């Protein structure tokens, strides 16, 4: 049991929800009434999101979600935070609960073989296994599994094209995929199986479940795991890390990254300096000045973020 005051729940469930629009308002009201913040996505294919609040509030929300007709038990990962990691609550209606942009992909019909965290090391140690990180390049940059391929994608929409262009690296291999919490791999493995590959596997519960269950001394994970909230990243045991966000481009920054000559808090980092004009950086510098003034007044320190 954690002593940290906020419970963070990452959840998803693929299930037919033809009336998903009607679920939005009750969910939003429940979250607002119980001080829950974060994001929930609803689509005809299911629900996905990460939220935070008191343990009791999150328990109420999960009970509400589980009781939605036709939904069933969501895939859940719990962690904890010292501060509220979200600024507001959003319940959004979407075409997909995780956007791949490929028509006809249905994880309920065909998906890879789930591998429990305790069995993951053995699978990826097999010399006939190719390990694929389905996340984005900025996530890979701060942590991944030993020997994992980086597809160098900026968004998940780019992943299908990477697979098509790299079929020769996958042919005749066991294909082991992983992502943060498991949802991207539901679609990634379904897509790859649809291309005719048979030996397709994915880490059940994703990196978060692995870091929670596998002891550090047995782990083959290197670095930190990027998360899409103000914690930025977590490590073994889902402990909060010292990774921060560049407030100009929202890339994750390690303490080493902040030593770069191109790093200026709130203005630029080595990753985005060349992508921005001097006018952009001047604007960001003014925003950062306002952030610091707001901090002195005790106001929101994340102006414009």
UniProtKB/Swiss-Prot annotation:
Keyword Oxidoreductase in the entry? The reply is yes
GO BP, one annotated term: tRNA modification
Q: Give EC number(s), comma-separated.
A: 1.14.-.-
- Active site as annotated: 179
DNA-binding is among the record's keywords:
no
Question: Could you tell me what reaction this enzyme catalyses?
Answer: uridine(34) in tRNA + AH2 + O2 = 5-hydroxyuridine(34) in tRNA + A + H2O
The terms under GO molecular function for this entry are: oxidoreductase activity, acting on paired donors, with incorporation or reduction of molecular oxygen
Which parts pass through the membrane? none
Which keywords label this protein? Oxidoreductase, tRNA processing
Instruction: Identify the residues that the record assigns to the Rhodanese domain, covering every copy.
Output: 125-219
NCBIfam families given in the database record: PRK00142.1-4 (NF001136)
What is the protein's known function? Catalyzes oxygen-dependent 5-hydroxyuridine (ho5U) modification at position 34 in tRNAs.
Which family does the record assign? Belongs to the TrhO family.
Protein name in UniProt: tRNA uridine(34) hydroxylase
Native source species = Brucella canis (strain ATCC 23365 / NCTC 10854 / RM-666)
Q: What gene, per UniProt, encodes this protein?
A: trhO
């Amino acid at each position: 049991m954690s002593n940290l005051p906020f419970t963070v729940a990452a959840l998803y469930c693929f299930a037919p929800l033809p009336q998903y629009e009607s679920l939005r308002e009750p969910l939003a009201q429940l979250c607002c009434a119980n001080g829950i913040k974060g994001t929930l996505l609803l689509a005809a294919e299911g629900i996905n999101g990460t939220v935070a609040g008191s343990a009791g509030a999150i328990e109420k929300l999960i009970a509400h979600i589980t009781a939605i007709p036709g939904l069933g038990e969501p895939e859940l990962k719990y962690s904890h935070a010292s501060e509220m990691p979200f600024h507001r609550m959003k319940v959004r209606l979407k075409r997909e609960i995780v956007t791949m942009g490929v028509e006809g992909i249905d994880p309920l019909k065909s998906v890879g073989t789930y591998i429990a965290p305790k069995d993951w090391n053995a699978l990826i140690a097999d010399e006939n296994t190719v390990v694929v990180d389905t996340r984005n390049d900025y996530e890979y940059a701060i942590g991944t599994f030993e020997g994992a391929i980086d597809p160098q994608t900026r968004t998940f929409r780019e992943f299908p094209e990477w697979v098509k262009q790299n079929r020769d690296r996958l042919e005749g291999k066991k294909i082991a995929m992983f992502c943060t919490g498991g949802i991207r791999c539901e679609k990634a493995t379904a897509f790859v199986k649809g291309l005719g590959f048979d030996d397709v596997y994915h880490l059940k519960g994703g990196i978060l479940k692995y870091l929670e269950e596998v002891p550090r001394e047995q782990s083959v994970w290197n670095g930190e795991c990027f998360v899409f909230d103000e914690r930025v990243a977590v490590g073994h045991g889902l402990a909060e890390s010292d990774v921060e966000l560049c407030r100009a481009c929202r890339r994750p920054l390690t303490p080493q990254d902040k030593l770069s000559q191109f790093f200026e808090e709130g203005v630029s980092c080595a990753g985005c300096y060349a992508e921005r004009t001097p006018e952009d950086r001047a604007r960001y510098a003014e925003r950062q000045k306002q952030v610091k003034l707001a901090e002195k007044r005790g106001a929101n320190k994340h102006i414009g973020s």
